[in-house]
Amino acid sequence: MKIIEIRHPLVQHKLGLMRINDISTKRFRELSSELSSLLTYVATDDLEIETVIIKGWNGLVKIARIKGKKITVVPILRAGLGMMDGVLEHVPSARISMIGVYRDEITLEPIPYFHKLVSRINERMAMVLDPMLATGGTVIATVDLLKKAGCHNIKILSLVAAPEGIAALEKKHPDVELYLASIDQKLNKYGYIIPGLGDAGDKIFGTK
């Protein structure tokens, strides 16, 4: 599995700010969007471009243009919504698919409860958004669903991940790509990432 941990100073600085315990909801949202934008910049590095001729201010000009790559952005509800605006800054014409998966707090097993996928998703590259890759179960369930629908070109964008979750994802879906800001230390006995960010969904939406 292709794993890209982005160590750029801007990424690491913004991630560090997100780890502050008493960060405001507003600031957490802003940083989540900013980091997602930076992750998208790297994750789209392999998009094909073509040369086209346009009419410029002083005649015809050759320019580079992305070559018809169809993308669907797939935020995992609900925390993935906090990453969506940052991603769409770079791919504003991407179609949006929604997948809802929650993790049972006792068994830690993923439970899908909703999905709405774009048509002809088999022709698109899916960019799955989930800020926290902990046990990997939620992302694995999402990729299972996408592949069942015929989509096999899948990139996952996460802010932080635990080694255990990465290993589980790689075992089940070695053909996906993972882009993230940090591979953290471990999971605790409750399945939370250490040091992690806390509950990203609660911090994005201001709930407890």
From Swiss-Prot:
Record entry for activity regulation: Allosterically activated by GTP.
Binding site for uracil: I193, G198, D199, A200
Name of the gene this protein is made from: upp
Keywords attached to this entry: Allosteric enzyme, Glycosyltransferase, GTP-binding, Magnesium, Nucleotide-binding, Transferase
EC annotation from Swiss-Prot or TrEMBL: 2.4.2.9
Domain of life, source organism: Bacteria
Similarity-based family: Belongs to the UPRTase family.
KW Magnesium (keyword) present: yes
PANTHER family in alphabetical order: ADENINE PHOSPHORIBOSYLTRANSFERASE (PTHR32315), URACIL PHOSPHORIBOSYLTRANSFERASE, CHLOROPLASTIC (PTHR32315:SF4)
Function: Catalyzes the conversion of uracil and 5-phospho-alpha-D-ribose 1-diphosphate (PRPP) to UMP and diphosphate.
GO biological process per UniProt: UMP salvage; uracil salvage
UniProt key word DNA damage: no
Pathway of action: Pyrimidine metabolism; UMP biosynthesis via salvage pathway; UMP from uracil: step 1/1
GO molecular function, one term: magnesium ion binding
Cofactor(s), by name: Mg(2+)
InterPro entries: PRibTrfase_dom, PRTase-like, Upp_B, UPRTase/APRTase, Ura_phspho_trans
Co-factor: note: Binds 1 Mg(2+) ion per subunit. The magnesium is bound as Mg-PRPP.
Reactions catalysed: UMP + diphosphate = 5-phospho-alpha-D-ribose 1-diphosphate + uracil
Annotated positions binding 5-phospho-alpha-D-ribose 1-diphosphate: R78, R103, D130, P131, M132, L133, A134, T135, G136, G137, T138, D199
Name of this protein: Uracil phosphoribosyltransferase
One Pfam family it belongs to: UPRTase
